[in-house]
């Protein structure tokens, strides 16, 4: 039987910052609010610890300097491989995530109850996060005559 702590979302905050530029003050002010999360480790994902050779989607978006799309992939990869909570840099934390750590995963909702990607929490190896991550293996990036930015390899 697993210990209770092993069956929780770990106290790790992940965030992505690609492009090498300094973080603007307004975003740093948001990141600074994360300090209320006592006992949490913060992991930054950037050019120093990402390979950009994960799949065709990552290679192409990196080559075309589409940094936001790169973050879409690496937020999922970080949460899948380490577990923890991904936060966009414009997220202000007002209270602890501790009450959510017993769940297998959680996502934020935005506007009209659409699922957002600014906050993603999950245990290491979570199958939902894996399924979302695997979608990028079947996604190409680029525009075509229809104006699509993304396209599934089966043409949908």
Regions found by a protein language model. Name each.
Residues 1-71, 87-156:
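Glycosyltransferase-associated regions of secretory-pathway enzymes
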Residues 73-84:
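Small-residue hinge/turn detector
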């Amino acid at each position: 039987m697993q210990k209770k702590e092993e069956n929780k979302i770990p106290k790790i905050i992940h965030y992505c910052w690609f492009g090498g530029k300094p973080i603007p003050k307004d975003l740093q002010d948001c990141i600074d609010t994360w300090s209320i999360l006592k006992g949490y480790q913060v992991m930054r994902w950037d050019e120093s610890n990402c390979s950009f050779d994960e799949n065709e989607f990552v290679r192409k978006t990196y080559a075309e300097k589409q940094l936001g799309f790169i973050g879409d992939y690496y937020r999922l990869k970080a949460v899948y491989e380490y577990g923890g909570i991904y936060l966009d840099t414009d997220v202000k934390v007002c209270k602890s995530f501790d009450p959510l750590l017993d769940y297998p995963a959680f996502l934020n909702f935005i506007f009209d109850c659409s699922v957002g990607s600014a906050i993603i929490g999950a245990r290491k190896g979570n199958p939902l996060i894996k399924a979302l991550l695997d979608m990028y293996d079947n996604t190409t990036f680029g525009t075509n005559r229809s104006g699509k930015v993304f396209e599934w390899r089966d043409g949908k």
